[in-house]
Amino acid sequence: MFDKYRKTLVAGTVAITLGLSASGVMAAGFKPAPPAGQLGAVIVDPYGNAPLTALVDLDSHVISDVKVTVHGKGEKGVEISYPVGQESLKTYDGVPIFGLYQKFANKVTVEWKENGKVMKDDYVVHTSAIVNNYMDNRSISDLQQTKVIKVAPGFEDRLYLVNTHTFTAQGXDLHWHGEKDKNAGILDAGPATGALPFDIAPFTFIVDTEGEYRWWLDQDTFYDGRDRDINKRGYLMGIRETPRGTFTAVQGQHWYEFDMMGQVLEDHKLPRGFADATHESIETPNGTVLLRVGKSNYRRDDGVHVTTIRDHILEVDKSGRVVDVWDLTKILDPKRDALLGALDAGAVCVNVDLAHAGQQAKLEPDTPFGDALGVGPGRNWAHVNSIAYDAKDDSIILSSRHQGVVKIGRDKQVKWILAPSKGWEKPLASKLLKPVDANGKPITCNENGLCENSDFDFTYTQHTAWISSKGTLTIFDNGDGRHLEQPALPTMKYSRFVEYKIDEKKGTVQQVWEYGKERGYDFYSPITSIIEYQADRNTMFGFGGSIHLFDVGQPTVGKLNEIDYKTKEVKVEIDVLSDKPNQTHYRALLVRPQQMFK
């Protein structure tokens, strides 16, 4: 009876199969999206990480001379137009569409050549609203609002990537376990060490000169604030463009490479023995990547093991293997505290304490290890926040927020130091650059950096000490602890965009350009921020990331600027307002679609 039933079942299956074949019906499943024009289907957010992008599938077409235009919204909308090269066409197997508006029926034109003919398609690409996954009772708005102050003629096409963040409801809930005192029992609490609590949700977007969001990196791409997984925690920072139009970045225990379509090209854990990557990543002409990290299980001179804070530079290749290491605890002087004791206790990098804003920091000899001001390995004595690579002599230039700007060779020897002279001992004291005026005449400055009868000034708690295309050194001079003291009133503080010319043979430094002092406290960013010279329009681009940080209950202003180099006229000024009060921004950078899809 069982055999009879089995034969009937098999016969029925065969009949159904033959019936499907006879009628030409496809196998079970839904049909793919049909072509939207003369090429293939349009796929919004093809990699699941950038919802304001799309892809026109090639559908096996072989095309060339591709140009994409995303039309502006309304009469004043900013049009985004760019070419697409063969490498990108092959990488995506489609035409990349970048710069869509959120929750909008975007009009997009794609032009190309195929079989010697000029072709063109117009598309309507629908997008949904972008979402901030990290809102709580502190939220002022869902997204970070923008306010366009000024855009001069000729700058309407500018696009700015804003690398900012938003607080999570749980705050910093993870710590590295430090080494217990030798007399501690097994049940005694263990101390914290390292910078694992440096943890916040990313908020990464591109804004146009109408203040519209034109790109968004999904917050879940690299981060997960709902799971206690250190591989998905940290502070997404150091977003820098590569020559290929991709971007490197760091976050906690990983470093990445990604592109504007949201494709993650590299995702590497930090090498064993290192932790807490923040602030900076940069690809060198050799194809390696420089990262700022801390050292795990570092044995101090007193025998105590700690995780160090922002004082090691790693060079890694694209497979993640270590090429070189700069250990600043051996190269510099981790006991120097000349600036540390002059800082505002209310803000150190993005660690903000409103209760102590405006008060001068106090250095205690027994300061606990961890992400706190203090001297020696295991404390925040260096705070390196930027790296520049100088190809002419295979050296690196570091902005050490708590020490100064330093150039170090491949041999780990200091070439020069740009900082006030106080606290530097031999042999490092001999590396201090000597200020000169435009005629090469020495400028007299006291040990705190106050200079006589001159506009020259050093930088204090600075960021982004980078080499410009002119060969000069440009720096965002935050200005906290200026002249190694706190002023009588907090409102006397100011920040500057500043440019120096360094003569390495003579060991001198000349200040050749500055901007911002005249704008006073309303331009003051105590922490974070960036400047970078833009040769295409002879401007100094800057982003003050922490303006009005200490205004209780108010959004923090991130101010995007382009300043005419010759006249110092403001060409662009756009404010970005944090979505929660007293929450700092980090950096911003100019992006050029014309260079991103080669």
Curated annotation (Swiss-Prot):
Main localization category: periplasm
Protein EC: 2.8.2.22
Catalytic activity: an aryl sulfate + a phenol = an aryl sulfate + a phenol; 4-methylumbelliferone sulfate + phenol = phenyl sulfate + 4-methylumbelliferone
Effect in UniProt of substituting H383L: Reduces enzyme activity by over 99%
Inducing factors: Expressed from a tri-cistronic operon that encodes AssT, DsbI and DsbL.
UniProt keyword terms in alphabetical order: Disulfide bond, Periplasm, Signal, Transferase
GO molecular function: aryl sulfotransferase activity; arylsulfate sulfotransferase activity; identical protein binding
Signal peptide: 1-27
Compartments, record wording: Periplasm
Cystine crosslinks: C445-C451
PTM comment text: The disulfide bond is crucial for enzyme activity.
Active site: residue positions: H463 (nucleophile)
Record-level GO cellular component terms: periplasmic space
UniProt xrefs under InterPro entries: Arylsulfate_ST, Arylsulfotran_N, Arylsulfotransferase_bact, AssT_Enterobac, ASST_N_sf
Main EC class the enzyme belongs to: transferase
Entries under Pfam families matching the protein: Arylsulfotran_N, Arylsulfotrans
Keyword Lyase on entry: no
Family: Belongs to the aryl sulfotransferase family.
PANTHER family, A to Z: CYTOPLASMIC PROTEIN (PTHR35340:SF10), PQQ ENZYME REPEAT PROTEIN-RELATED (PTHR35340)
Assembly: Homodimer.
Further comment found in the protein's record: Most commensal E.coli strains do not have a gene for arylsulfate sulfotransferase, in contrast to strain CFT073 and other uropathogenic strains.
Record's function text: Catalyzes the transfer of a sulfate group from a phenyl sulfate ester to other phenolic compounds. In vitro, is able to use 4-methylumbelliferyl sulfate and p-nitrophenyl sulfate (PNS) as donor substrates with phenol as the acceptor substrate. Cannot use 3'-phosphoadenosine-5'-phophosulfate (PAPS), the donor substrate of mammalian sulfotransferase.
Protein name per Swiss-Prot or TrEMBL: Arylsulfate sulfotransferase AssT
Organism field: Escherichia coli O6:H1 (strain CFT073 / ATCC 700928 / UPEC)
Gene of this entry: assT
